[in-house]
């Protein structure tokens, strides 16, 4: 497939490649037995479209974030399909496994001789569900639907109205952030993010220390979360409105930020769990079935943690390549890998504290959460510059995303803040949203 500079044609090509990535594993799941040589042959057939998607990604738009997101999704699908075709249920999933697990619906509704199309649709839904929602393999801590929608996500209409209203508010917020980014003085890049600054710790001014503490909080809790969540909501609207998906299968992407008072909770409860099932399944296969580490053991636990974060770092290094940074320049591999060490430290402190207070109630008090949030921000202030400063220098004061229409430029920042606040309170009142 020839690479193109026309965004519309590039989008069409990427959509076709994603369709190939989804249909090949779905077809193999329902037609081949476990350990079939066709499954092994299918993996490179799924990986090649991922390579082409990566090549096409820079031509899709002027938004570095969304181009990188699509490039990484293609690669992530490969890891997901290795699990579905070769690892899960000892040799990969088959149609019989889908029926027994209830993924294909109730057994009475899905006889063994169900039509080929019905089987294919069931398999496709599993392939596109990177978190395994509503399956026996659902990623741990996948957030439930909000109480305002009910456990099943509510009716199609109520789901679409809620998602559309929240997405509109997120769009306004991203519009404001885009304008704020444009107004940042260009000299700040050299002042705060100059080369080598990410590894400087001792000779920092008070202003530089504040930037280090403030930037990770804004980047992870606000900007990155908004960009990912708005993209997820837009996709949910597209799939549910078209009938390709149901509200039940499009659960919230993020948990509550109030749970992020430990590093383990930040990544395991608050942050999205899209990488969790594809990566942990492959890592567990390596450590437990190939290397045969003792289970359960601290060696197994922390080796798995490290390897999962290492894979995440590699994936984000690939993402950084879209903006012209090499894997080494991006700093993503040491950054994400460092969280394995951070979790070891906090697990040790928590174990020591619990041993001293073994006779007391283990409920997490407010003061413990405050201390925990301070710890999370502290660790991120130490390590986030490794990953964020190189990309900040690369975009040089520009935003990593673009919007089709900038309302802030039309009505001005003061009125935009008022609109954002008013609409936000309306959305909060009408749909019971939370942080």
Curated annotation (Swiss-Prot):
One GO MF term attached to the UniProt entry: O-acyltransferase activity
E.C. code: 2.3.1.-
InterPro entries membership: Wax_synthase, Wax_synthase_dom
Keywords of this entry: Glycoprotein, Membrane, Transferase, Transmembrane, Transmembrane helix
Gene Ontology cellular component terms for the protein in this record: membrane
Keyword Membrane applies: yes
Biological process according to GO: terpenoid biosynthetic process
Topology within the bilayer: Multi-pass membrane protein
Main location: membrane
Known function: Acetyltransferase; part of the gene cluster that mediates the biosynthesis of the meroterpenoids arthripenoids. The pathway begins with the HR-PKS atnH that catalyzes two chain-extension steps to form a reduced triketide, which then primes the SAT domain in the NR-PKS atnG to initiate three more cycles of extension to give a linear hexaketide corresponding to the polyketide part of arthripenoids. The FAD-dependent monooxygenase atnJ then performs an oxidative decarboxylation at C11 of the atnH/atnG product, via an electrophilic aromatic hydroxylation with concomitant ipso-decarboxylation.
The name this protein goes by in its record: Acetyltransferase atnC
Source organism of the structure: Arthrinium sp
Gene that encodes the chain: atnC
